[in-house]
């Protein structure tokens, strides 16, 4: 039986493999969630560069958040990354949820990014 860490890595790789088949050159909106914070990056895999990023640890958000581990914080991070991505000239992305299910904080971040102007 695979360890928890191996199972998470296998699940994340499976999701990323599916994304690469449908990406068509679009950047990847990669999300990582920890127990206390949430992090998101817009990554151009062809160039190997990060185009925009945001997290609950950003100075723009840190003062206004009670905690980085709730759906309200995830929604603020989603809006912030959408704003930064549009400044960088990115409108369309593919959503990389990694090994996390599309529920709760991940879903709140995705919906806020869509409202902020990103399409996926």
UniProtKB/Swiss-Prot annotation:
GO terms for cellular component: cytosolic large ribosomal subunit. It comes from Rhizobium rhizogenes (strain K84 / ATCC BAA-868) (Agrobacterium radiobacter). InterPro entries: Ribosomal_uL18_bac-type (IPR004389), Ribosomal_uL18_bac/euk (IPR005484). Belongs to the universal ribosomal protein uL18 family. Keywords: Ribonucleoprotein, Ribosomal protein, RNA-binding, rRNA-binding. Part of the 50S ribosomal subunit; part of the 5S rRNA/L5/L18/L25 subcomplex. Contacts the 5S and 23S rRNAs. SUPFAM superfamilies: Translational machinery components (SSF53137). GO terms for biological process: translation. This is one of the proteins that bind and probably mediate the attachment of the 5S RNA into the large ribosomal subunit, where it forms part of the central protuberance. This is Large ribosomal subunit protein uL18. One of its GO terms (molecular function) is structural constituent of ribosome. The lineage of its organism: Bacteria, Pseudomonadati, Pseudomonadota, Alphaproteobacteria, Hyphomicrobiales.
């Amino acid at each position: 039986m695979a360890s928890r860490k191996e199972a998470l890595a296998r699940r994340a790789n499976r999701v990323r493999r599916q994304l690469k088949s449908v990406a068509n050159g679009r950047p990847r909106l990669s999300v990582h969630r920890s127990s206390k914070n949430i992090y998101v990056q817009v990554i151009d895999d062809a160039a190997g560069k990060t185009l925009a990023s945001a997290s609950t640890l950003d100075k723009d958000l840190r003062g206004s958040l009670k905690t980085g581990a709730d759906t309200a914080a995830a929604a603020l991070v989603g809006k912030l990354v959408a704003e930064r991505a549009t400044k960088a000239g990115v409108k369309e992305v593919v959503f990389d949820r990694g090994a996390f299910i599309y529920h709760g904080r991940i879903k709140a971040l995705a919906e806020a990014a869509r409202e902020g102007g990103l399409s996926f």
